[in-house]
Every structure is written in C-alpha cells, then in structure tokens.
Amino acid sequence: MAALRVSLVTLSDFAVRTASTAALAPMILFIVWIGEWVFFLLLLTSIVLLASEWNRLTGGSGAAFSNMTFVVLAGGSLASAWFFGYIEALVVVAAAVGVEALLAWRKKRNVPFAAFGPIYIIVPLLALMWLRGQPVVGIGSVVWLFLVVWSTDIFAYLIGGTLHSAKLAPSISPGKTWAGLIGGVTCAGLAGGIAGAYLLSIEAFVFETWSTGIQLGIFIGVTAQIGDLGESWLKRLRMLKDSGRIIPGHGGLLDRVDGLMTSAPMMAVLVWVVG
C-alpha cells in the first residue's frame, strides 16, 4: 500500500509537471524559431530570475546589494554578447566572478559559491545565444537540445518514481534512483535520434547521421542528470526544497533548467568542434 501511495503521488506530481511543460514548451519553441531580439529577451528574463534564485540558494555574497549586483552583471554579459561579441561577454563574466568573490570575502561568506555563480548562471545562457545564432543549424541545435533535456528530465522522474529501484544518491537526493537515471538517459538517446532524423531531413541538424543523434542524446542526457544532481546537492546543503516557486510542479526556474545549465555549454562545444 505504501508503494502504491508513493506511485500515486509520483503520478500526480508528474501530471502537474507535464501540464506545466505542455503549456510552456510550445511558447519556448516558438520563441526559439523566431530568434533575434525575442529570443534575447527570453534569455535576459531568464538570467534575471536565475541569478536571483542562485543568490537565494547560496546566500549570495552577503552584501546588501548582492542580488542587484549579480542581476546587473548577468544581464550585462548577455547584452555585451548581443551588442559587441562573446569575447566582451566573457570579460563581463570574469568581472562578475571577481566582484562576487570580493563581496563575499568582505562579508565573510562562501567565496567559492559566490565566485562560481556567474559561471554557472551566465555561461549556459551565452551558450544558448551562441547556438541559436549559428547559420542554418542554429534553430535545430537549440530545439534538439531542449527536446533531449526535457525527455531525460520527464522520464527520469516518471520511471524512477514508479519502478522504485535502488537509490542513486540517497544522501543528496533521496528520490532519485538508478532506474530513473537509466530510463531518463535512454529516453534522451531515443529523443536525440528521432529529433536528429527529422532535423537531418530538413537539413537543420549539425551532425551527419541520426545515429549520432542517439549517441549525443545519451551524452547530453548524462550531463543533464549531473546538473540535476548538482542542484539537488546544493538544495540539500542549504536545506531548501526548491529554488523558487515560479513554475507549478517544478518550483523555481532553476529547478526546471538545472540539466540545461550543464548540457548547454557541452552542446555549444560539440557544435563548435563539428563546425
């Protein structure tokens, strides 16, 4: 009965998650398709929310204006990439690392967390902006990445919650299981292959075969799961259930995109190497 109760709760939570994703996904994909300043505004809005949630999770630098400083620097890095270039944007990221570390040191806060924040929050969104800006394959690369990460996230949660296998990392995230990890990564591979095959048919996929899509889907699925586990560790450390409350069934925005934060830079590197 207890196992049945857990399964019903899991399915109920899954229904809320699925409804949230179903409502948001078409809008996000439409914005990716439009690109240009609309996609830039989506990233800019996201980075403001993510910077605020990161400060909530880690305590930030401890300065009275810590949140505002981080938000301004994070937004400034995206604006630098948009108006000037990615080298200039990375200079702003480096400046943000220095400022956050200095403020944390002065307030005797956790300097490594404060310094890592700009890298963790800003670089993935710069990677998404760079990916979308690639000629011909830009839209396909971002759409493929989103579909793979969404697949591993949804099916890891569903499979892990229903099969009740051995715990993956009980001291970090008691709800995560080996079945969820394997199921989520497998579904990421399938999504990568299917999406890759379609994108190849319209010449919008950067890689040459659909089987490469499967292999990369598995790889991105693993990196997304690592990102999910990393955020779970941080929440456990700070004794918080969610990074925020903005998305029903998911908590904060960071809870929804934690896998994307690790997989987007990896995808950008792969596309850069192939290109």
Where are these regions (language model features)?
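Juxtamembrane boundary at the C-terminal end of a transmembrane helix
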Residues: 268-275
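Hydrophobic side chains within alpha-helical segments
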Residues: 20, 56, 156, 231-234, ...
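Interfacial loop-to-transmembrane junctions
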Residues: 236-259
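Short helical (or helix-break) motifs at transmembrane helix termini and adjacent helical loops
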Residues: 151-161, 224-236
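Hydrophobic transmembrane alpha-helical segments of multi-pass transport and channel proteins
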Residues: 218-226, 253-261
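Re-entrant/interfacial helical elements at transmembrane boundaries that shape
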Residues: 161-162, 234-238, 261, 266
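Membrane-embedded alpha-helical bundles of polytopic integral membrane proteins
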Residues: 1-218
